[in-house]
Amino acid sequence: MDFVADICVCSLSIRRMDELGSLIPSNRREKTKESYFGTYHHSTSAASKKVRAVVKAMFTDAFASLPFGRHDELRILDAGCGLGFLSCVSAEFYKNARITGIDTFEHTSLKRSSAERAKENARILGFSDRIDFKKSDVFKFTPNEKFDIIISNLVFHNFGKMRFEAYSRLSSWTHAGTFVAMGDLFFRPKTDIAHLTKAFKIMREIKPKRGFGQYALLVMSKE
């Protein structure tokens, strides 16, 4: 995950932070401990929490539009999971889903990143039995199953021109009926969109109301 300096988090339109920006531990005994999802590059702790509030709202909107029940037993992949924020958001929304989160856990854009910290976040929030974090990247990951939903946030732009190969690899982990929710800073029509539409049908484009640069969340389906 990599947030850049030109994201104007102070002007974001958000609701109460405890409603959107926080994930509440499902086990009351864990309330004395706090999850830590990191401070993004060129950001502060408070600003990063506001960014996550908006991201959670947008992905929750995307999940609500998919033809799945909240208690369906889904297989979800979080490609570039960082410290597990989006993995936990999906586990909170889809109550019986099993989530696999992959990351190198080495990117300098997210301070104190580690698989151990991601696992601890899931444990604190009560999702450790349904989230499995693996140290890998999209170019080396070889799953033995196909996924019902693939999620990713602010990952693919980091790959430069190699992102097109990454898009193709992502497509190989899907089956007919898979949905992809991908948030990123740019989706260029002649390159990114053209490549993605070879494999997926774009159903929706969700954007923040203002102040989030060129960020957009694409909701796509595999047919």
Predicted feature residues:
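Conserved SAM-binding loop of SAM-dependent methyltransferases across substrates and taxa
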Residues: 83-95
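A short glycine-rich, Lys/Arg-flanked "PGG" loop and its adjoining helix->strand segment in the class I
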Residues: 164-176
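Class I SAM-dependent methyltransferase Rossmann-like catalytic core
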Residues: 30-66
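A short SAM/SAH-binding and catalytic strip from SAM-dependent methyltransferases
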Residues: 149-162
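S-adenosyl-L-methionine
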Residues: 112-140
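Conserved beta-strand signature within the Rossmann-like core of class I S-adenosyl-L-methionine
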Residues: 177-185
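A short acidic, Gly/Pro-enriched loop at the edge of an enzyme's catalytic core
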Residues: 139-150
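Conserved class I S-adenosyl-L-methionine
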Residues: 72-82
